[in-house]
Amino acid sequence: MTKIAARLLAVLAGAAFLYALRVYPFGHGWPSWLFAALLPSYFLLLCWRPALWLFCLPALLPVLDLAPWTGWFFLEEIDLLLLLTVACGYWRLHQRPAAMRLSPAARLWLLLCSLAWLAALLRGLLPLPPWDANAYNNYLSSYNSLRLGKAWAWAMLLLPLLLRDAGHGGWRRYTLPGLLTGLSLVAGCALWERAAFPGLLNLSSDYRITAPFSAMHTGGAALDGYLALGLPFAVLWLVRARPRWHSAAALLLLALALHAALATFSRGLYAAMLAAATLGFVYAVKQLLAGMPAAQRTSQGSRTVLSLLLAAAVALALIAMFGGAGYRGLLAAVVLFSATFVLATHALPWRLAPASAVCALAIEGVLSMLWPGDVAGWLKGPYCLFLLSALLLTGALWPGMRPAGTVRLCLAMLAWTMLACNLAWIGWHWGGKPALPGAALAVLLAAVMLCNRRLHPPLWRLQRGSLSLAGAAAVLLALAIPVSASYYATERFATTAGDLQGRLRHWQGALDMMPADAASAAFGMGLGTFPATYYWHNRLGDVPASISHMEQAGERYVRLASPGYGAGYGELLRLLQRVSLRPDTAYLLALDVRRTGAMPVLQVRLCQRQLLYAQNCISAPLRLRPGDGLWQHYALPIASAWLGSGQWLLRLPVQLELAASGTAVSSVIDIDNLSLRAADGVEQIANGQFTQAGNDWFFSSDHHHLPWHIKNLALQLYIESGWCGVLSLLGLLMLASVRLLRQRSQGHANGYANVAALAAILAFLVVGLFDSLLDVPRITLLFYLLLLGALLQPSAPSPTLCHESTPP
């Protein structure tokens, strides 16, 4: 690209940014203020260090999503950042040469993908519909093609910047930390949502977390796909961490990300995690055995098998402990096994073990008899003594002290014995006699682990790698066991066969709706056309609920269409707006309603809601008069009660919900002039007259998601892009995978990073077996950037460009 062309593109992007800034709906409280402050800060960062976009975009792509506040999901906040990135990046594109390049094969496949994308985009977009109030606020619009198509367009616009900035360690220095930052933000959002709504320990609820992904308002797997992409890089950070605080931070991030992944209750994501873990395990074993003589390789293989058997036994013991003693027993068992893992790496004075055990039992017996019985909570005997034993063991083995001598090791063995006794006591206290077998199994297995140093060589040593692996395993088991044993997870796995049959029927129905002509087979029906195709042509005769903005005599209003399903009741489509309420306050709700018959019925509620699944709702006492085709005004009191209570993070978001509920035949109801005021007269509803169409309003379909998603990545590609789209992206995937595998097999210095990238791609595709991930532009763009990073290679060998700096 010439300098003049780059500057011209920068000017166009800058002009588009200024126009988007002018029309973007600011003014939605603290989210808008944060976004308004972010834009100039990001601009200054790019002026200072142009390559910082490699950090900022991966960090902000998943979380910069204000659609539930603004109602805008065609032009998103991340689009403004991308316009700013292109404008600043292309203006300075030629200040230094590109450090990376693409192979001829990569250029060819990118060209083929671009041609397939362009054909699918035009087929979905043309003929251009009128640019009215419904053009950009629903998925039935032909302009939905632009919404889905922008991911590839952004990826191609960022490619020259990637070639310039990813080299010389730029990818490793900026992009990987950006991915980890984004993952930590998403995991934090998931943790807050889980704690705020169903509760962290409430695993029987069917509540589905969405974290910051507003695209999940009609279902889909945006969170699943993002976690599939991000988790391998969290593991990579843990594997490569050098300072202790890096290892601790990586382990904490992995724990948060694993919690978010497990709390989705997504079977597809679980399968993706298993596939990625299998790939990583195979690579680690091959690295471990590489270069060993045959005899040593056999010995190492036997030790690996023995380690796996031991890990399986520990998992079974933890499962038994959780089944008998619940969360507290599980936590105690995890602590015991962790302490045993560390203690077993020392040369224990076994000749003094009987004396240590006798002393421990005596101390434990005396303390248990003297401990007061009228205390509550963690001050109860088994819990407090367990904690004291753990602290004593930690002090005896504290790594900052000089090498452990006989006295300290005897003290550690005494503390370990007390820890084991208190574990059994916790089981008895919490679960009674049924908990004792699990506790006995855990103590016996921990005692066997203490014999680690008697093996030659031992199964593990106290090293950074073994500690990281043990910590990751402890976190995984501590999180996975309660989730897998929960009622909701059990129910999900029990219905897998039936759900798969339903998914197969949906896939067949999607294929049946596709026109049987050569052009559709080659180029697809067009990007983003599936929701409209399902609405008009599904073979079941169902009519999904819809929301549209109408205009009459210069006045705009919103029209809600109730669902019409042959089987009877259908899932409602809820029109939502976030409102700021004071608790225990009387409000007056006013609105104008028009309908022509007895149906549909209008539901008006104030609910605590993040995105999906409302809770603690207060319904407005609305009783509609018989429909006569004329506007009817209603004013009714509604009390906020508990809604709006709490401070800052403890205050759950409150949303006003409107939904049309009818019979098996779809019918419509019109709404206008919505108002919600307290005695002070301050209006709580923005755009209640709908003069700005869908601004400030969002919508959700909580349970029925099939009208919006094909639910398979490959099938989505075929239906919307045809064989050209499928084969071109398949070729690009194969090329990227082969390059990553080739670098790994050649002993590349960045081998673990290549395996992490390959595992992320694999996990994303596994999630895509059961969901369509390419209908969320921000996730699709992140996936494309990862693919492009895998295709890059150094422009020319130089002393300053080593293999380690080659993406990913």
Identify the role of each PLM range.
Residues T2-A20, L38-F43, V86, R107-L121, ...:
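Alpha-helical transmembrane segments of multi-pass inner-membrane proteins
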Residues A59, L66-A67, N712-S721, Y752-G789:
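Membrane helix-loop boundary segments at the extracytoplasmic
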Residues L179, L591, L602-R605, H633-A679, ...:
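Extracellular beta-strand ligand-recognition surfaces/modules
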Residues T210, A215, L258, D542-P583, ...:
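A conserved mid-to-late transmembrane alpha helix and its immediate loop/hinge
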Residues R505-E551, A679-P707, K711-L717, S721-S728:
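TM-adjacent membrane-interface loops and short helices in multi-pass inner/ER membrane proteins
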